[in-house]
């Protein structure tokens, strides 16, 4: 069934967005936020998001207020969800957009009572209350584009944007600089960032291969920097165990999310799996080589002019959920991606970036 298009006036409104996904997802909606801000002159834009990832958009100029929601902690229950919705309702929202519909987004929406409500349904109940219901996950476009299509269906004509972007602060930049200085890094040094983990083991290119890639670029004069969260340190240790070079920096567990974003921007090249750090490096203008296995590179690849996704197989577009793909076993393991292909992609990215300067 063909879905409807609408014409929405976004100017001089209080606009609430509900989007409670993960680190990388928050980076992927930055073009949406940029276009909405341009269209919504005189409006206040509020973003309801997972409290764990609020640093990812803390300094985004296209968001006026973040409403953090501790959905895995003290606000996990339905009563807390309803309470937050009632609190937001006191701001008298003119427009509510749910970019990822869930039972929780439905409850929030019903509690806040916006004048107009659009986006993705969280339950069948939503269709009785929504003014502009739509299917957002159509499995035929990149994550960035599927959210821009929401605005297009709401009548926005000018969809041009600056790509995925993350924004830091002078404080984060200062702390990132201090960290690098403590590791003996000078302003002339070139760094290669590596993020060896992801949300699930099946999405991880072998850590030992990351170590060998790090060795190759260390020989070229770049200093490998291993980023990550503390739980990824065992993986990083496997990578380090495969290295001959003893010159590397272990940044995992030593930087906040915002400080990582600042530190990532200092790199000349990055290697990652399909993960939040992939989008961060890319959003900071770093040539990013991203390895994909059971997740679909066509939906999630980095967008930078010098970035590239390498997939273990040509996954067709269509309905996809990485956990279901893993459970089915209908994919080529990410370990099948060769080290030689990854190194060649990195060399090409560096050369292309140099030509673009």
Please place each PLM-identified region on the residue numbering.
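Catalytic machinery of carbohydrate-active enzymes
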Residues: 1-357
């Amino acid at each position: 069934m063909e879905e409807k298009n609408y014409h929405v006036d976004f100017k001089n409104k209080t606009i609430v967005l509900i989007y409670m996904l993960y680190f990388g997802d928050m980076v992927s909606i930055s073009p949406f936020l940029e276009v909405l801000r341009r269209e919504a002159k005189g409006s206040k834009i509020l973003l309801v998001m997972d409290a764990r990832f609020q640093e990812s958009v803390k300094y985004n100029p296209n968001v006026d207020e973040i409403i953090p929601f501790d959905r895995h902690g003290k606000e996990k229950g339905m009563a807390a969800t309803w309470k937050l919705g009632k609190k937001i309702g006191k701001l008298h929202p003119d427009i509510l957009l749910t970019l990822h519909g869930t039972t929780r987004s439905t409850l929030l929406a019903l509690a806040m009572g916006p004048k107009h409500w659009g986006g993705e349904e969280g339950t069948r109940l939503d269709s009785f209350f929504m003014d502009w219901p739509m299917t957002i996950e159509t499995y035929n476009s990149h994550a960035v584009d599927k959210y821009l299509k929401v605005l297009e269906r709401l009548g926005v004509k000018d969809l041009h944007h600056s790509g995925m972007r993350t924004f830091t602060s002078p404080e984060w930049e200062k702390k990132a600089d201090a960290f690098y200085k403590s590791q003996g890094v000078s302003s002339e040094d070139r760094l290669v960032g590596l993020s060896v983990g992801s949300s699930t083991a099946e999405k991880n290119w072998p850590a030992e291969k990351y170590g060998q890639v790090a060795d190759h670029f260390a020989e070229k004069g770049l200093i490998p920097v291993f980023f990550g969260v503390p739980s990824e340190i065992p993986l990083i240790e496997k990578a380090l165990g495969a290295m001959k070079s003893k010159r590397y920096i272990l940044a995992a567990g030593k930087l906040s999310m915002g400080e990582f974003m600042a530190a990532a921007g200092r790199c000349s090249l990055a290697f990652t799996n399909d993960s939040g750090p992939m989008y961060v490096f890319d959003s900071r203008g770093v040539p990013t080589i991203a390895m994909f296995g059971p997740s679909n590179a066509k939906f999630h690849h980095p967008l930078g002019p010098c970035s590239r996704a390498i997939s273990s197989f040509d996954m067709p577009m269509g309905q996809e959920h990485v956990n279901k793909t893993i459970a089915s076993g209908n994919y080529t393991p990410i370990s099948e991606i060769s080290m030689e292909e990854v190194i060649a992609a990195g060399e090409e990215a560096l050369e292309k970036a140099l030509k673009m300067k």
